């Protein structure tokens, strides 16, 4: 009976290790695919595999965030008004996710300042006032100076 339990436990462990390695291999493939598209400046093709990896395993590699910023900036510049607002919000969300997943590589003040600059650049599209944007910059300055 003990041997039977041991065999079941070991087989379960082997199956779970195989599943984890398969997932890791899929992540490596997706990273390779979208990074090659980004290097070739084919951001539209890079978007789908990048988003899949970002949602599934954001801690896998910091390139998700570095290349993701390039992809979203391209999408912002080359999209219609409604989509543009979604991509702007997604870029701000991406920076926050980078801060959460890679805190040593991402100082909070930098993220807040980048977000405030993004809001300033697209103030009219986001229906924001100068006062709203000023408050964001002020918050970034206060947070970074602490």
Identify the residue ranges that each predicted region occupies.
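Post-signal peptide N-terminal segment of secreted/secretory-pathway proteins
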Residues: 24-27, 32-146
């Amino acid at each position: 009976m003990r041997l039977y339990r041991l065999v079941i436990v070991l087989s379960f462990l082997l199956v779970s290790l195989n599943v984890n390695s398969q997932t890791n291999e899929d992540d490596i493939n997706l990273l390779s695919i979208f990074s090659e598209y980004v290097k070739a400046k084919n951001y539209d093709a890079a978007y789908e595999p990048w988003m899949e990896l970002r949602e599934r395993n954001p801690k896998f590699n910091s390139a998700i965030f570095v290349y993701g910023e390039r992809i979203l900036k391209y999408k912002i510049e080359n999209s219609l008004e409604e989509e543009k607002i979604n991509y702007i919000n997604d870029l701000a969300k991406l920076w926050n996710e980078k801060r959460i997943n890679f805190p040593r590589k991402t100082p909070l003040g930098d993220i807040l300042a980048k977000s405030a600059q993004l809001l300033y650049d697209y103030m009219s599209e986001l229906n924001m006032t100068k006062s709203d944007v000023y408050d964001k910059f002020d918050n970034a300055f206060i947070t970074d100076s602490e």
